Amino acid sequence: MNQKPPPYGYGGAGGGGVGPSSTSNTTIIGTLSARAKQTTQSMITTLRPWREILDLSALSLPRGYDEAMAHLKHNISYFRGNYALAVLAIVFLGLIYHPMSMIAFIVVFIGWILLYFSRDANDSIVISGKEVDDKIVLVLLSLVTVLALVYTDVGENVLVSLIIGLLIVGAHGAFRNTDDLFLDEESARRGGLVSAGSGNRPPSSYTPI
């Protein structure tokens, strides 16, 4: 009499079969690890030498509002990695007397990086074979962030630290002279300093004599 084969993912006593859930978990962990490595490498490549930020001789008073905004836009594109680390450092300093809150903040921050900011348009999250919409991911991450701030009772500390960090970044960006800061074409386009089609502009034609 023929026996029915065991269900998929369940081996015999010596089969050592691996269930689909185990394979799925391994795939998710591998994807997150690769994404974390790629994000870290990308952030490192955007960092500029800190001596360029701390160069006091490069600070000057802008001649007007338009020049200050031009400086700010250029410096944010150039120092974006350094500015992000500076703001995070200020937030961490605001939580230095709240170690549990700092741990919660780090976990939430890593979640935002891995599950939202480091993903491109074609990189979707799949759970149990179903694709999760980006709006759901955004809502869930926002909810977790709010709950973390409420239950750790440091929402005011984080808000004040963020405001201080953004004010420092804004002041530095507006007063830092940009004459010695040269952006590559991709960074300039991302910062809105050049039009999207300027890099693909064909060379001007000429008539040989």
UniProtKB/Swiss-Prot annotation:
Assembly description: Interacts with PRA1B1, PRA1B2, PRA1B3, PRA1B4, PRA1B5 and PRA1B6.
Annotated function: May be involved in both secretory and endocytic intracellular trafficking in the endosomal/prevacuolar compartments.
Biological-process GO terms, alphabetical: vesicle-mediated transport
InterPro entries: Prenylated_rab_accept_PRA1
Record's subcellular location: Endosome membrane
Cellular component terms (Gene Ontology): endoplasmic reticulum; endosome membrane; Golgi apparatus
Origin: domain of life: Eukaryota
Region of interest: Disordered: 1-20
Cross-referenced Pfam families: PRA1 (PF03208)
Record keywords, A-Z: Endosome, Membrane, Transmembrane, Transmembrane helix, Transport
Family: Belongs to the PRA1 family.
Feature: compositional bias, Gly residues: 9-19
Membrane topology: Multi-pass membrane protein
Transmembrane intervals: 90-110, 132-152, 155-175
Chief subcellular location: membrane
Protein name: PRA1 family protein E
Tissues where the protein occurs: Expressed in hypocotyls, roots, lateral roots, columella cells, leaves and shoot apex.
